[in-house]
């Protein structure tokens, strides 16, 4: 059995889709469906069972036996970069993750988890090393601290000449693609621009967006990276992006190209994002490629075109 926490979320459900495409259906989905709209991400997927996050965590902490587990993909988290309740974020993203990690280590279960490019903050160097990290928000800090916790475990194991079972963290950059419709304001720029176009409006970008560049990575490619590491059992913390920053304008151009009409309008940059907003991200893929991962990433033009075709099907 494979367990996917956050399995009703965007990345988790796309990992399940990729597993299903391999014929794997013995999957336990763990999630928190207070946002009931997320159920739509599971409707077309084949799974063995569903469990509420709180019930699952209680059983993990009690050391309950789930039978043989091939791997756990830990995608469940509070992923809102605008959430400033630090106690809530640290409990969900840090404390819960530690409990699940130690459950896996005790049983030698491969543990593949979601980190984030939000760990880097305002920098132009995105290498998976502590000197380049400095989160701008509580979400990024929670992910940074869990990465550091994992690093300490690796260091301690090395000092005691021990070998730990697989632990693999993925620093997701700006992920976009199918199964994100439940995310509200946290959905991708491509999603929001498409909605604006379908409402008969022009696509709207923040003032200065021509200078904002992000590493936009298609969710299907993210799922492929996860499965590559499942197959190869490589431990480490790895960037998961295309390695090429592209502007928000490029996203808008791709959406406009699909719809065949429209032009970009600018709106004022919101005050609540000032000082907590990454203006530039670009994954350094040196470590990912050195591990042997050969997944090829779609450009914005390629990925957005595929995405638009999927979400605009009649």
Swiss-Prot record:
Pathway involvement of the protein, from the record: Nucleotide-sugar biosynthesis; ADP-L-glycero-beta-D-manno-heptose biosynthesis; ADP-L-glycero-beta-D-manno-heptose from D-glycero-beta-D-manno-heptose 7-phosphate: step 4/4; Bacterial outer membrane biogenesis; LPS core biosynthesis
Positions annotated to bind substrate: 174, 185, 192, 206-209, 214, 277
Catalysed reactions, semicolon-separated: ADP-D-glycero-beta-D-manno-heptose = ADP-L-glycero-beta-D-manno-heptose
Keywords recorded for this protein, A-Z: Carbohydrate metabolism, Isomerase, NADP
Biological process (GO), any one: ADP-L-glycero-beta-D-manno-heptose biosynthetic process
InterPro entries associated with the record: Epimerase_deHydtase, Heptose_epim, NAD(P)-bd_dom_sf
Named cofactor requirement(s): NADP(+)
GO molecular function: ADP-glyceromanno-heptose 6-epimerase activity; NADP binding
Outcome recorded upon mutating residue 211 to H: In strain: 169-98 / Serotype O22
Assembly with partners or alone: Homopentamer.
Written domain comment of the UniProt record: Contains a large N-terminal NADP-binding domain, and a smaller C-terminal substrate-binding domain.
Role: Catalyzes the interconversion between ADP-D-glycero-beta-D-manno-heptose and ADP-L-glycero-beta-D-manno-heptose via an epimerization at carbon 6 of the heptose.
Protein name: ADP-L-glycero-D-manno-heptose-6-epimerase
Organism for this UniProt entry: Vibrio cholerae serotype O1 (strain ATCC 39315 / El Tor Inaba N16961)
């Amino acid at each position: 059995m494979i367990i996917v926490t956050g399995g009703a979320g965007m990345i988790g459900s796309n990992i399940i889709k990729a597993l299903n495409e391999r014929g794997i259906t013995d999957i336990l989905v763990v999630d928190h469906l207070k946002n009931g709209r997320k159920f739509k991400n599971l409707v077309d997927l084949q799974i063995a069972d569903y469990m509420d996050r709180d019930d699952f965590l209680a059983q993990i902490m009690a050391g309950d036996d789930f039978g043989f587990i091939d791997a756990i993909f830990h995608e469940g988290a509070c992923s809102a970069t605008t959430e400033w309740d630090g106690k809530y974020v640290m409990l969900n993203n840090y404390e819960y993750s530690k409990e699940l990690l130690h459950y896996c280590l005790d049983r030698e279960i491969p543990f593949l988890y979601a980190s984030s490019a939000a760990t880097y903050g305002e920098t132009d160097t995105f290498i998976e090393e502590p000197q380049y990290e400095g989160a701008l928000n509580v979400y990024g800090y929670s992910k940074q601290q869990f990465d550091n916790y994992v690093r300490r475990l690796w260091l301690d194991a090395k000092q005691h000449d021990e070998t730990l079972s697989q632990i693999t963290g993925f620093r997701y950059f700006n992920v976009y693609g199918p199964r994100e419709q439940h995310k509200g304001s946290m959905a991708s720029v491509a999603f929001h621009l498409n909605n604006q176009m379908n409402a008969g409006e022009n696509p709207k970008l923040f003032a200065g967006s021509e200078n904002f560049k992000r590493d936009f990575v298609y969710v299907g490619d993210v799922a492929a990276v996860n499965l590559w590491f499942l197959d190869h059992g490589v431990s480490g913390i790895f960037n998961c992006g295309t390695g090429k920053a592209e502007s928000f304008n490029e996203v808008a151009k791709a959406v406009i190209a699909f719809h065949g009409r429209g032009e970009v309008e600018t709106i004022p940059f919101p005050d609540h994002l000032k000082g907590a907003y990454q203006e530039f991200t670009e994954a350094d893929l040196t470590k990912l490629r050195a591990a042997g991962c050969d997944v090829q990433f779609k450009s914005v033009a390629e990925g957005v075109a595929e995405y638009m075709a999927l979400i605009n099907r009649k």
